[in-house]
């Protein structure tokens, strides 16, 4: 796996925890945590080591248990992306920012636990669009949100057409804002 790591960035997990360190949405791509108990222990450890930091405006990076963890907080949600100790921090940070921004687009900038729980399917679709078996597929939030909105619309039919239009309009607005800054 070391040879693969040199050529293709790998993500070990993506965690979305609440302000108490409890799971909202998590996805593991590595066998480093073989049991559910070890996964929960890792989540608790990461949360306890990062919860006192101020990662609200920009992402922070730390090294925990031979893993690079990049993280960012918003409202009552804590976003984490974990990679190996030799992984490129900028790639992990791009994955984190893409996930955070895509979730913000899909939740219409209402990035809080209750809204996330009500739209958990969209969050898991974001994860699926971003990373597959640990390999980074996409980090552009507009692309991710657009694909998720289309998948969501296909799954639920005509009722979601309005949601798709709203998501695409929000994505367009976000893109325009990012081009102006």
Curated annotation (Swiss-Prot):
InterPro entries xref list: AP_mu_sigma_su (IPR022775), Coatomer_zeta (IPR039652), Longin-like_dom_sf (IPR011012)
Keywords assigned by UniProt, alphabetized: Cytoplasm, Cytoplasmic vesicle, ER-Golgi transport, Golgi apparatus, Membrane, Protein transport, Transport
Entry-linked CDD domains: Zeta-COP
One Pfam family matching this protein: Clat_adaptor_s
Location of this chain's protein in the cell: Cytoplasm; Golgi apparatus membrane; Cytoplasmic vesicle, COPI-coated vesicle membrane
Record text on subunit structure and interactions: Oligomeric complex that consists of at least the alpha, beta, beta', gamma, delta, epsilon and zeta subunits.
Function in brief: The coatomer is a cytosolic protein complex that binds to dilysine motifs and reversibly associates with Golgi non-clathrin-coated vesicles, which further mediate biosynthetic protein transport from the ER, via the Golgi up to the trans Golgi network. Coatomer complex is required for budding from Golgi membranes, and is essential for the retrograde Golgi-to-ER transport of dilysine-tagged proteins. The zeta subunit may be involved in regulating the coat assembly and, hence, the rate of biosynthetic protein transport due to its association-dissociation properties with the coatomer complex.
Species assigned in the record: Arabidopsis thaliana
UniProt-listed GO biological process terms: protein transport; retrograde vesicle-mediated transport, Golgi to endoplasmic reticulum
Topology in membrane: Peripheral membrane protein
Protein name: Coatomer subunit zeta-3
Gene3D superfamilies, per the entry: 3.30.450.60
């Amino acid at each position: 796996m070391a040879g693969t790591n040199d050529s293709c960035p790998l993500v070990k997990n993506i965690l979305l925890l609440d302000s108490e360190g409890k799971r909202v949405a998590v996805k593991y791509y590595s066998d480093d945590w073989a049991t559910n108990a070890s996964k929960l222990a890792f989540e608790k450890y990461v949360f306890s080591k990062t919860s006192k930091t101020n990662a609200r405006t920009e992402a922070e990076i730390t090294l925990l248990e031979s893993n690079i963890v990049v993280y960012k907080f918003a409202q009552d949600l804590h976003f984490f992306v974990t990679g190996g100790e030799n992984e490129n921090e900028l790639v992990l940070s791009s994955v984190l920012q893409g996930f955070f921004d895509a979730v913000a687009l899909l939740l219409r900038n209402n990035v809080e636990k209750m809204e996330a729980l009500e739209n958990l399917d969209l969050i898991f679709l974001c994860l699926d669009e971003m990373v597959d078996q640990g390999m980074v597929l996409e980090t552009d939030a507009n692309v991710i949100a657009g694909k998720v909105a289309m998948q969501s619309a296909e799954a639920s039919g005509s009722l979601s057409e309005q949601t798709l239009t709203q998501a695409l309009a929000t994505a367009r607005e976000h893109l325009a804002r990012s081009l102006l800054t």
